[in-house]
């Protein structure tokens, strides 16, 4: 053999030896699954009853489910093999790092602790003793299991415990446990996690737009959230002081403000936020202060959470009212057929969430005033002015339907209600306008025109007693009739004749009712963030529902068990 050939053999042998050595060293530098399993069991066994924690002050959100999972697995690690993290383990860490793109909050899954622990276990780490310690591998395995169980539950049902919002809701961890078992059968962890997400267009559209929002967002600075509506002035003052310090509008030693100082501070904030400078605090000021990227992201989280809990499938044709947007839309086969501004209930006379079907249209309707309005508005006004009913054009009727003379009633004898119906006759001055859309519901709510059409020019349109006023009522009734399949008549032309009839009734100011055969499904819902025209639209939390969910989410993501 020549020297060149021998040299080649030597080099190949050296490479083989090096590879074998590296593999051997790699195993020795990590640890074996048997040792990790022993440490997992020890970590749990060493805890006092009830076993809701493990060592080193790490935090768990699903302690009971996590412990049960390891008992079922005989304490074998679920994310680690002899050579280190499994592919699924690495995928899960990456998922948690990017969990915002799924509308989830990183802090809910021990991201900081997992990252710190993971860095100690890297082969290029300076923490050689830490890397060789099986207890550290046990810790990260437990943290990953806890995170997985939390993520699957949150992707499936949201952050909020169902029984906190719904009395008849039930919760079962069985499917999350089954998903955990399935991670040992496939390397496609992402598919397992995404299988828990809603498939609805509303959810998926919002999710698709999240990366663009996140790429432009700045989460580097945390700002104090200002509660609204203001229910406690002292709390509000404390919050606005703290918030102002964060923007260097107040010295750090300020702890309280008198009324003049508060007004001057508000003026500073109004100037900075390009608001009208009047020194008065209210809705616009607080909206501007809470308009941070962190709060916008949390609003997205809240609404994706709603979509996870409210998994609805919609028909090909339906009417949609999103209350915070102050808009109505009619969708047909994914296309928007009608869009209209709406006026919704005031915060103290809210429009309820409703699922129903529009089954009647009435021209020049009368208005039978709800008992709640009679108690709160009508009766007090009658007591102040005997001529109130006549001035408003209201009539009253007894239980038998007989008209009653208001002057014959001793109004002072009634405190909370009256044994009469109060009815406003149809006409241009009627509060319902000249068109009403009926749909069965227990709240006596309907869509209608209005005699105060100028209010549609307002940007904030939470102004009604609870019903939904529709600006484009004329387009809506024509769409409903033209798309209706009349009984025993397949000729669409006959629907056109009916539209003409309705126009005739309107011109003649006649009260008529049209029954709809092909009833139009209607959904009245509440979403403060939604996709529209390829971007995320944010809407004001008109009824304070976001605040309720925000508080529940913050409470639910605070871990309930400590690794101590």
Predicted regions and their residues:
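Sec-dependent signal peptide hydrophobic core
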Residues: 5-14
């Amino acid at each position: 053999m020549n020297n060149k050939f021998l040299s080649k053999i030597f080099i190949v042998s050296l490479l083989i030896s090096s590879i074998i050595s590296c593999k051997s060293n790699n195993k020795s530098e990590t640890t074996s699954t048997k040792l990790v399993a022993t440490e997992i069991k020890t970590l749990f066994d060493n805890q006092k009853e009830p076993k809701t924690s493990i060592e080193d002050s790490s935090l768990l959100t699903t302690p009971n489910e996590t412990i049960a999972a390891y008992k079922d697995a005989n304490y074998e690690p679920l994310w680690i093999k002899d050579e280190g993290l499994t592919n699924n383990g690495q995928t899960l860490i990456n998922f948690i790092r990017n969990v915002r793109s799924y509308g989830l909050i990183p802090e809910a899954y021990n991201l900081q602790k997992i990252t710190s622990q993971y860095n100690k276990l890297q082969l290029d780490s300076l923490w050689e003793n830490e890397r060789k310690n099986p207890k550290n591998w046990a810790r990260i395995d437990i943290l990953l299991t806890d995170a997985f169980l939390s993520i699957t539950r949150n992707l499936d049902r949201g952050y909020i415990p169902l029984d906190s919002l719904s009395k008849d809701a039930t919760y079962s961890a069985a499917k999350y446990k089954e998903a955990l078992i399935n991670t040992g059968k496939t390397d496609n962890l992402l598919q397992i996690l995404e299988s828990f997400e809603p498939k609805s267009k509303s959810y998926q559209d919002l999710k698709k737009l999240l990366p663009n929002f996140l790429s432009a967002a700045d989460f580097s600075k945390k700002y104090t959230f200002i509660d609204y509506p203001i229910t406690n002035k002292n709390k509000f003052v404390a919050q606005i002081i703290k918030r102002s310090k964060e923007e260097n509008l107040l010295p750090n030693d300020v702890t309280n403000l008198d009324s003049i100082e508060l007004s001057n501070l508000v003026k500073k904030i109004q100037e900075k936020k390009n608001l009208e400078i009047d020194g008065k605090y209210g809705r616009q000021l607080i909206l501007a202060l809470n308009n941070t990227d962190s709060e916008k992201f949390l609003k997205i989280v809240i609404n994706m959470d709603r979509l996870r809990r409210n998994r609805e499938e919609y028909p090909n044709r339906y009417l949609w009212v999103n209350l915070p947007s102050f808009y109505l839309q009619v969708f047909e086969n994914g296309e928007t057929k009608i869009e209209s501004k709406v006026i919704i209930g005031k915060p103290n006379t809210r429009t309820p969430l409703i699922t129903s079907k529009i089954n009647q249209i009435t021209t020049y309707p009368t208005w039978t005033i709800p008992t709640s309005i009679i108690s709160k508005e009508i009766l007090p006004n009658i007591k102040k002015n005997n001529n109130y009913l006549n001035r408003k054009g209201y009539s009253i009727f007894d239980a038998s339907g007989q008209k009653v003379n208001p002057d014959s009633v001793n109004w002072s004898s009634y405190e909370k209600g009256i044994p009469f119906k109060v009815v406003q006759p149809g006409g241009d001055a009627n509060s319902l306008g000249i068109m009403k859309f009926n749909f069965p519901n227990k709240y006596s709510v309907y869509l209608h025109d209005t005699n105060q059409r100028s209010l549609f020019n307002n940007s904030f349109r939470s102004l009604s007693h609870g019903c939904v006023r529709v600006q484009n009522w004329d387009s809506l009734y024509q769409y409903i009739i033209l798309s209706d399949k009349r009984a025993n008549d397949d000729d669409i032309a006959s629907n056109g004749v009916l539209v003409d009839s309705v126009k005739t009734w309107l011109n003649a100011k006649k009260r008529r009712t049209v029954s709809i055969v092909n009833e139009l499904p209607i959904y009245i819902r509440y979403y403060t963030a939604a996709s529209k025209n390829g971007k995320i639209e944010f809407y004001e939390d008109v009824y304070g529902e976001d605040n309720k969910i925000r508080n529940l989410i913050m409470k639910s993501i605070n871990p309930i068990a400590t690794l101590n």
